[in-house]
A protein has these predicted regions:
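Sec-dependent signal peptide recognition
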Residues: 1-3
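C-terminal motif of bacterial Sec signal peptides marking the signal peptidase cleavage site
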Residues: 8-12
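Acidic/polar, low-complexity intrinsically disordered N-terminal segments immediately downstream
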Residues: 14-113, 122-204, 210-215
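Active-site-adjacent structural elements in folded domains
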Residues: 98-100, 231-236
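Short proline/glycine- and polar residue-rich coil/turn motifs
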Residues: 103-111, 226, 237-246
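Ligand-binding face of N-terminal immunoglobulin V-set domains in extracellular IgSF glycoproteins
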Residues: 113-119, 248
């Protein structure tokens, strides 16, 4: 009986040595990282509103049920100069905001979203004043007590351009239309749209411009005449929903 008990105790001790938490070093039990890490080029749009950019920080490792904390920091201009040696300019802190810079993960949380809000007016003006520079926001994760994946710890945002979206007709060429005398009503579709990806709900207003007709006739030596009011109709206000770049008038 004593010998049997000794064997059982020895077996139990041997098995405990091979449990996962004993095989994996403590620093790998929970590891934090940025989902879309690395260098990301970002185009901003002048819309009269702040532009937003979202990214996520994840908690992984051999035991992601553990709690964890991490902070989002920004490399200084001196650090960027030393790391890259090119004409990068770190975006001034008053040109943007972050909804949070510290992330505390509960046991059941595997990821947290972070949203950046950037001022296109301020960034665009800085780019115009210093056209040789590329403006960047070099973010990185840091934690006093938890591990960070060194390969996915940084998000280096480069501002590729600041554009003003424009709405226009998809075809601006003269399009002659022929109708038989005495017809009742005839419809024609005229395409219009946005020249960039549409992240907004755009309200478009349409009107007839007699001055444009006069200018066109004078420039091209034509004698086009405007249809009398009441002989045509169109929706003066049209919406271009988010996610849609073109539609018909």
């Amino acid at each position: 009986g004593i010998a049997c008990m000794a064997v059982l105790l020895l077996t139990a001790c041997d098995e405990s040595k091979y449990e996962l938490e004993n095989l994996v070093p403590d620093e790998y039990h929970k590891v934090l990282y940025i989902n879309n890490s690395g260098m990301q080029d970002l185009t901003l749009y002048n819309t009269g509103e702040l532009n937003t950019y979202a990214f996520s920080v994840y908690k992984g490792g051999s035991d992601p049920s553990l709690t964890a904390s991490v902070e989002i920091a920004i490399h200084s201009q001196e650090e960027v100069d030393a790391l890259y040696g090119v004409n990068y300019r770190v975006i001034p802190s008053d040109f943007y905001s972050m909804d949070t810079r510290r992330l505390d993960f509960a046991s059941d949380e595997r990821s947290k979203a972070v949203t950046l809000s950037l001022s296109t007016d301020l960034i665009g003006a800085a780019m115009e004043a210093n056209p040789e520079a590329t403006y960047v926001l070099p973010l990185y994760l840091t934690s006093e007590k938890d591990s960070v994946n060194a390969d996915k710890s940084e998000l280096f945002i480069r501002i590729a351009d600041v554009l003003t979206p424009t709405v226009g007709f998809t075809n601006t060429d003269i399009q002659p239309l022929s109708y038989t005398y005495g017809f009742d009503t005839q419809s024609v579709e005229i395409g219009f749209g946005l020249d960039t990806d549409n992240n907004w709900e755009v309200e478009c207003r349409f009107a007839v411009d007699p001055e444009y007709l006069s200018s066109y006739n004078g420039k091209h030596g034509t004698a086009y005449r405007l249809l009398p009011e009441g002989n045509y109709s169109f929706e003066e206000i049209n919406l271009l929903p988010a996610g849609t770049t073109t539609t018909d008038l």
